[in-house]
């Protein structure tokens, strides 16, 4: 009687995971890292790690960014936060105050009058702090490279960690830059910059 037959179990079937359509195998089933983590969890029931590794892991998954949108690249930066790309799924959430942010995205043409404000905002950010230079104008002046009022790259004012090329760069390029920054943080692994 009902939807369950008398010889079936009440428990749900074991999940199959995501199958790669090209090979027909589970995605990540041959990844050494995941195999080691699964083996350790099945044997002990918990993981052992160092405090530095745990802090680095937490920092890469909780980057708070502050926009410094100066021109048309800021439109692509806004698009990156919309549901189609949703950069928050990578642990990359916006903040309005520089005192609460880890990453500053400089998007657009930096003029000589705006350079002191950029440096002031950068100095207000807590350590460790990172800068992503987005677009050819922020990277090297762009179309306005020879103008008397344009800084030829924001790296002359603040240290830049990741350069995202393009005019304007796509939202995918910015997401790739974010992932590269997370990889850089994991690779350096230190709390101090």
Curated annotation (Swiss-Prot):
[4Fe-4S] cluster binds at residues 72-73, 137, 167. It is a peripheral membrane protein. It catalyses: a quinone + NADH + 5 H(+)(in) = a quinol + NAD(+) + 4 H(+)(out). NDH-1 shuttles electrons from NADH, via FMN and iron-sulfur (Fe-S) centers, to quinones in the respiratory chain. The immediate electron acceptor for the enzyme in this species is believed to be ubiquinone. Couples the redox reaction to proton translocation (for every two electrons transferred, four hydrogen ions are translocated across the cytoplasmic membrane), and thus conserves the redox energy in a proton gradient. It is found in: Cell inner membrane. It comes from the Bacteria. GO terms for biological process: aerobic respiration; electron transport coupled proton transport. This is NADH-quinone oxidoreductase subunit B. Its cofactor is [4Fe-4S] cluster. Transmembrane segments: none annotated. Pfam families: Oxidored_q6. The gene is nuoB. Binds 1 [4Fe-4S] cluster. NCBIfam families: nuoB_fam, PRK06411.1. The lineage of its organism: Bacteria, Pseudomonadati, Pseudomonadota, Alphaproteobacteria, Hyphomicrobiales. InterPro entries: NADH_UbQ_OxRdtase-like_20kDa (IPR006137), NADH_UQ_OxRdtase_20Kd_su (IPR006138). It comes from Bartonella henselae (strain ATCC 49882 / DSM 28221 / CCUG 30454 / Houston 1). One of its GO terms (cellular component) is respiratory chain complex I. Its EC number is 7.1.1.-. GO terms for molecular function: 4 iron, 4 sulfur cluster binding; iron ion binding; NADH dehydrogenase (ubiquinone) activity; NADH:ubiquinone reductase (non-electrogenic) activity; quinone binding. Coiled coil: none annotated. Keywords: 4Fe-4S, Cell inner membrane, Cell membrane, Iron, Iron-sulfur, Membrane, Metal-binding, NAD, Quinone, Translocase, Transport, Ubiquinone. Its main location: membrane. NDH-1 is composed of 14 different subunits. Subunits NuoB, C, D, E, F, and G constitute the peripheral sector of the complex. Belongs to the complex I 20 kDa subunit family. It is an enzyme of class 7 (translocase).
């Amino acid at each position: 009687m009902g939807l369950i037959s008398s010889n079936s179990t009440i428990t749900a079937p074991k999940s199959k995971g995501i199958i790669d359509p090209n090979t027909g195998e589970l995605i990540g089933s041959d990844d050494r890292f995941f195999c080691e983590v699964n083996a350790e969890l099945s044997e002990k029931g918990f993981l052992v790690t160092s405090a530095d590794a745990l802090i680095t892991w937490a920092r890469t998954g909780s980057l708070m960014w502050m926009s410094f949108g100066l021109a048309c690249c800021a439109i692509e930066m806004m698009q990156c936060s919309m549901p189609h790309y949703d950069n928050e799924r990578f642990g990359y959430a916006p903040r309005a105050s520089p005192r609460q942010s880890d990453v500053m995205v400089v998007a657009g043409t930096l003029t000589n009058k705006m350079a002191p404000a950029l440096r002031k905002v950068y100095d207000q950010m807590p350590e460790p702090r990172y800068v992503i230079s987005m677009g050819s104008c922020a990277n090297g002046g762009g179309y306005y490279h020879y103008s008397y009022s344009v800084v030829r790259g924001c790296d002359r004012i603040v240290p830049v960690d990741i350069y995202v090329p393009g005019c304007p760069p796509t939202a995918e390029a910015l997401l790739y830059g974010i992932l590269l920054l997370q990889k850089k943080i994991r690779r350096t692994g230190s709390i101090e910059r």
